[in-house]
Amino acid sequence: CLRVYQERVEYWSQFFDYLPKFSIRIRKMTTRWGVCNRGNNIVTLNSELIKKDITLLDYVIVHELSHFKEANHSNRFWNEVSIRYPNYKEARRALRD
């Protein structure tokens, strides 16, 4: 499980030019798929994502890494996400179902 998360984070990180040195945490969360803590440079990913299609894990990773540039969900934030993950709206819908 951890290996898959690490491989996907490593893959997606190459598409960002503004990432700080950050750590990954995997834990079960009840209300979120991921969290980016910019204060201590930790990205936490929900362990339940491993049960979903790999493309949804990819979306959450791109979403959280984009928070290193844009803290909130502004239009600029969604532009950052869409540059790297154009089908983000479909992924968001799938995670809500």
Task: State the predicted function of each range.
Residues 1-59, 68-97:
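Active-site-proximal or metal-binding-adjacent scaffold patches in catalytic folds
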Residues 64:
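Walker B catalytic acidic pair
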